[in-house]
Amino acid sequence: MRLKTLKFPFVNKKNTRTFKKKCGRFLSYFIGLTVALTFLFRFVPIPFSAYMAEQKLAHIIQLDFDYKVNYDWISLEDISPYMQLAVIAAEDQNFPNHGGFDWNAIKSAIKYNEKSSRIRGASTISQQTAKNMFLWHGQSWIRKGIEVPVTFMLETLWSKKRILEVYLNIAEFGNGIFGVEAASRYYFKKPAKRLTQSEAALLAAVLPNPIIYKANRPSLLVRKKQAWIIRQMNSLGLNYLKKL
């Protein structure tokens, strides 16, 4: 007796081609929109980032309607040079020199991750800006794949100063606290232009995870990171910013 082969009407070449076309069309729209927004935001302040929207939506889904995004855009000239240097010292000391990706840091991270149970990242300030601006958070090869061309776009269309300016304005420094101006006023009751070296280093120390690491209640680990950042800042010197 001959068995009939089961056929699923929703799995065929036509549906596969249609799905691929839709994916290709979506990717084309996404790339086009990203290029347009990247060019636009080369000149105008960022009204909000994808990560801000993601956080707001996540809290609404959880029925937390009290969550608010605390965000104030300011120009790079209104941000303390100590704060500018602090994030470079903490996150990406090769920022003035690379084209969006620090290949030496990536190689070091791969070697470290092969030997350690803890994961070390190697994302540059440019990559983090691309992620916060246009993408979603979380470990995903899809996101990482999209992050690469978006980072190249930022490096191509924006200056290093603009990338740093946007990064400092949209980075999260606490629950609902986005940007260094909002963080400075929340934690230190002063504008970001008046941040001291110690205060700037403390804010930079919480950047890996500002929900766990808190600037208003710094743990011993955060204090150690702050002290390390200050040493790195002293080693680099404020003149390092002239390379941007």
UniProtKB/Swiss-Prot annotation:
It comes from the Bacteria. Pathway: Cell wall biogenesis; peptidoglycan biosynthesis. Gene3D superfamilies: Biosynthetic peptidoglycan transglycosylase-like. The keyword Cell membrane applies. Keywords: Cell inner membrane, Cell membrane, Cell shape, Cell wall biogenesis/degradation, Glycosyltransferase, Membrane, Peptidoglycan synthesis, Transferase, Transmembrane, Transmembrane helix. One of its GO terms (biological process) is peptidoglycan biosynthetic process. It is found in: Cell inner membrane. GO terms for molecular function: pentosyltransferase activity; peptidoglycan glycosyltransferase activity. Its EC number is 2.4.99.28. It is an enzyme of class 2 (transferase). InterPro entries: Glyco_trans_51 (IPR001264), Lysozyme-like_dom_sf (IPR023346), PBP_transglycosylase (IPR036950), Pep_trsgly (IPR011812). It catalyses: [GlcNAc-(1->4)-Mur2Ac(oyl-L-Ala-gamma-D-Glu-L-Lys-D-Ala-D-Ala)](n)-di-trans,octa-cis-undecaprenyl diphosphate + beta-D-GlcNAc-(1->4)-Mur2Ac(oyl-L-Ala-gamma-D-Glu-L-Lys-D-Ala-D-Ala)-di-trans,octa-cis-undecaprenyl diphosphate = [GlcNAc-(1->4)-Mur2Ac(oyl-L-Ala-gamma-D-Glu-L-Lys-D-Ala-D-Ala)](n+1)-di-trans,octa-cis-undecaprenyl diphosphate + di-trans,octa-cis-undecaprenyl diphosphate + H(+). The chain crosses the membrane at residues 26-46. GO terms for cellular component: peptidoglycan-based cell wall; plasma membrane. Signal peptide: none annotated. It is a single-pass membrane protein. Pfam families: Transgly (PF00912). Its main location: membrane. Peptidoglycan polymerase that catalyzes glycan chain elongation from lipid-linked precursors. Belongs to the glycosyltransferase 51 family. PANTHER family: BIOSYNTHETIC PEPTIDOGLYCAN TRANSGLYCOSYLASE, MONOFUNCTIONAL BIOSYNTHETIC PEPTIDOGLYCAN TRANSGLYCOSYLASE. This is Biosynthetic peptidoglycan transglycosylase. The gene is mtgA.
